[in-house]
């Protein structure tokens, strides 16, 4: 394999080691680089690149270019992307894009593999009959839930959500026996969310938890719990930002919206189109 030879660097000269290092760092760029461009980028010459390709067992740069890119693409798709530090300071834009795409795909795959479809049916049936849905979340979780709220409103489902945590206890106290209360928290220990759940539990209200922590307060106090298998730290001191958890929560809420919409597809489609028409009409007046 070309990649293996580039990593071992057996019998490489200093110049060849420099070329190998460049290729391993900027492999995706090679697809569109001429031999002259690669020579300039590695401070070598076209003849040096040609000799290097032959040393790798190939008869020229063109063949090397095709085979190397194919191997490099497969090589970079191996392994697990660190959810806390999915890219490094040395990565190219293309490498960052591929790593984030891989992290997102892997996050959704793991989320789907953990779904209990009987549970999802129970939750969706309860949501469909609810007088309203209260969302208890803060920070990133609340940002994800905001889009869910907007989507649900399109077919007439009331979702209460606030970006100010001081209002969460009020939602808990006004919840009825027909209200679905949805708590979203990665750690499952956010103080404002947990305190609201205590009020809900005291009043024997129905609660659904979405969390990454199975033994958390949120998981223990909710009748239904959707767990996400995400190896991402809670503290921003231990990660670049929130990537995997955001993707997992967003995907789950997208599924919830889709399940509810599908329950009465024709009616919901009609309602969303009517709302879109009225909104358009009001803007034109």
Predicted ranges, named:
Residues 12, 16, 35, 42, ...:
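Generic structural signal for well-ordered, non-membrane alpha-helical segments
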Residues 18-24:
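Pre-recognition alpha-helix immediately N-terminal to the DNA-recognition helix
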Residues 128-247, 251, 255-263:
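Glycine-rich phosphate-binding loops that contact phosphosugars or nucleotide phosphates
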Residues 22, 123-126, 171:
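CheY-like receiver
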Residues 2-3, 14-15, 28-32, 40-43, ...:
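HTH-adjacent hinge/linker in prokaryotic transcriptional regulators
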Residues 1-9:
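Short, Lys/Arg-enriched N-terminal segment that forms or immediately precedes the first helix
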Residues 264-285:
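A short, charged, Gly/Pro-tolerant segment at domain boundaries
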Residues 118-130:
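Glycine-rich phosphate/diphosphate-binding loops that line cofactor/substrate pockets in enzymes
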């Amino acid at each position: 394999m070309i990649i293996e030879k580039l990593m071992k660097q057996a019998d490489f000269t200093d110049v060849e080691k420099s070329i190998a290092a460049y290729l391993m760092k900027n492999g995706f760029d090679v697809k569109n680089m001429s031999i002259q461009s690669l020579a300039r980028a590695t401070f070598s010459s076209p003849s040096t690149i040609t000799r290097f390709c032959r040393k790798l067992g190939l008869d020229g740069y063109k063949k090397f270019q095709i085979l190397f890119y194919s191997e490099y693409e497969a090589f970079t798709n191996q392994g697990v992307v660190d959810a806390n530090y999915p890219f490094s300071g040395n990565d190219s834009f293309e490498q960052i894009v591929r790593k984030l795409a891989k992290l997102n795909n892997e996050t959704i795959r793991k989320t789907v593999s953990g779904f209990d479809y009987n549970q999802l049916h129970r939750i969706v049936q309860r949501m469909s009959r609810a007088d309203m849905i209260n969302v208890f979340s803060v920070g990133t979780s609340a940002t994800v839930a905001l889009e869910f709220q907007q989507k649900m409103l399109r077919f007439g489902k009331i979702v209460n959500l606030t970006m100010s945590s001081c209002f969460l206890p009020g939602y808990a106290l006004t919840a009825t026996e027909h209200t679905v209360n949805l708590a979203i928290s990665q750690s499952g220990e956010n103080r404002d969310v947990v305190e609201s759940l205590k009020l809900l539990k005291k009043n024997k209200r129905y609660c659904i938890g979405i969390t990454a922590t199975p033994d958390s307060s949120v998981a223990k106090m909710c009748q239904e719990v959707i767990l996400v298998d995400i190896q991402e730290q809670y503290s921003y001191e231990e990660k670049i930002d929130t990537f995997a958890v955001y993707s997992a929560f967003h995907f789950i809420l997208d599924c919830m919206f889709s399940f509810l919409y599908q329950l009465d597809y024709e009616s919901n489609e009609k309602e969303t189109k009517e709302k879109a028409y009225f909104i358009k009409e009001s803007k034109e007046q």
